Amino acid sequence: KKVHKRSSFANPRILICVPTGSTPVERKAIQDSALAAGARRVQLIEEPIAAAIGAGLPISEATGSMVIDIGGGTTEIAVMSLGGVVYSNSLRVAGDAMDGAFANYMRKEYNLMIGDSTAEKIKKEIGTAIATNNNTYAVKGRDLRSGTPKEVGITEEDSVEALNPILREMINGIKDAL
């Protein structure tokens, strides 16, 4: 038996999701980077299409399907029908901006400096657009006045206030799609 000297894992064919708003230059840079890293073949697919396929939405039918994909750096909004994208928009505001909004809110309202990982934990634990419960979350950070460690309790109301500017921008993007 002959043993293959080349493994298909050594030079894979890869599919990369890209934001709908990415420029041809950005797309080319992504492809070139993947090829330089050893990919045999590179194909790009827009993030909302990949999300719709993954969610099992009927994008090939004559009905409209809307996908809102909130990633780290971008929020992708797309309407698809009959196998194609009817409308798409990529907002440069998403999960990372939410983390930043929590960090800024804690600094402004509580004089508390928190790190990126703490801001992300707040988002995951108590982040909400509409306060429905009286949930609170203990946040540890550094007091900006004294420089000492400090812990404060924040509520869902704090979350609503912190996220409001980010969510307002996303809502406006969704309204544009409608």
Q: What feature does the model see in each segment?
A:
Residues 1-70, 78-178:
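Nucleotide/phosphate-binding catalytic cleft detector across ATP-hydrolyzing
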Residues 73:
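Conserved Rossmann-like nucleotide-cofactor binding loop
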